Amino acid sequence: MSWFTPELIEILISVLKAVVILLVVVTCGAFMSFGERRLLGLFQNRYGPNRVGWGGSLQLVADMIKMFFKEDWVPRFSDRAIFTLAPVIAFTSLLLSFAIVPVSPTWAVADLNIGILFFLMMAGLAVYAVLFAGWASNNKYSLLGAMRASAQTLSYEVFLGLSLMGVVAQVGSFNMQDIVNSQEHVWNVIPQFFGFLTFAIAGVAVCHRHPFDQPEAEQELADGYHIEYSGMKFGLFFVGEYIGIVTVSALIVTLFFGGWQGPFLPPFIWFALKTAFFMVMFILIRASLPRPRYDQVMSFGWKVCLPLTLLNLLATAAVILYNAQ
């Protein structure tokens, strides 16, 4: 009797696909840190990292070696267990958020019927990591940064979820494959433009990226909630932020820009090209926009994004009811 039954082979193939996809996501997040510095140098008329390797190509390797050998320091009077757990939760929750994204018709870590709800759950779990880091560090700047981050993230997650409800109502499913298949003729960005706009803004805010990086503002909070972190613990926070950018970019592509669909090229290539475009847009936003005050960020969310999201949802519901008659 052979152990390698068809069912076992299918399970092994699924596990292999999941490992490959998640490793690619981590690699993309790591390489984006180097690409961002090079692009920012280009935008600001300077060189950027160009000393290690040809044209700075080994800068990422040098950063990893440096981070690996730095002292793994824990501050006095801190809660060691929670201090250590926070970066692990941050990294894991952001990485698992990508699990529901189909990169091709047959490649996805998990094909869940509640795919969008799973993403919102993982995004909410990342808030606990920020709170744990701020509280366990026993540092006033860390705590202030954590309070800012949690309030901002929870506020913009409201708009993040509501902006997706128009797509869900239009398609009639929370499943990501169903959403991609529904865009065979028309991308969702056309009927759901305001949903796309609010989702993109909320995605930048949830990732704590410029101009919504008040929780980590160096001029005000000396790097915010991860001021006390060093070594690999800081590395998990650092790479996790870029994994969040990759995940939000992939979700924008999947939900509003047809996912892996496109002519001539293989599906995975289309998905990668579209995702790379929005990753570059994250960097361009950082290079071109100033940082507003924290109260302006919160007011913009509740006074602009929320009404826009609700109007989009009401308009979508009205169109669906009209077409059903």
UniProtKB/Swiss-Prot annotation:
Principal cellular location given in the protein's record: membrane
Enzyme class: translocase
InterPro entries: NADH_UbQ_OxRdtase_su1/FPO, NADH_UbQ_OxRdtase_su1_CS
Keyword entries, A-Z: Cell inner membrane, Cell membrane, Membrane, NAD, Quinone, Translocase, Transmembrane, Transmembrane helix, Ubiquinone
Catalytic activity: a quinone + NADH + 5 H(+)(in) = a quinol + NAD(+) + 4 H(+)(out)
A single GO BP: aerobic respiration
Subcellular location: Cell inner membrane
Disulphide linkage map: none
PROSITE patterns in the record: COMPLEX1_ND1_1 (PS00667), COMPLEX1_ND1_2 (PS00668)
Gene Ontology cellular component list: plasma membrane
EC number(s) recorded for this UniProt protein: 7.1.1.-
Short name of any one Pfam family annotated for the protein: NADHdh
Recorded superkingdom: Bacteria
Transmembrane intervals: 11-31, 81-101, 114-134, 154-174, 186-206, 237-257, 265-285, 304-324
An MF annotation (GO) of this entry: quinone binding
Lipid bilayer topology: Multi-pass membrane protein
Function recorded in the entry: NDH-1 shuttles electrons from NADH, via FMN and iron-sulfur (Fe-S) centers, to quinones in the respiratory chain. The immediate electron acceptor for the enzyme in this species is believed to be ubiquinone. Couples the redox reaction to proton translocation (for every two electrons transferred, four hydrogen ions are translocated across the cytoplasmic membrane), and thus conserves the redox energy in a proton gradient. This subunit may bind ubiquinone.
Family: Belongs to the complex I subunit 1 family.
Subunit architecture: NDH-1 is composed of 13 different subunits. Subunits NuoA, H, J, K, L, M, N constitute the membrane sector of the complex.
Name of this chain's protein: NADH-quinone oxidoreductase subunit H
Organism whose genome encodes this protein: Yersinia pseudotuberculosis serotype O:3 (strain YPIII)
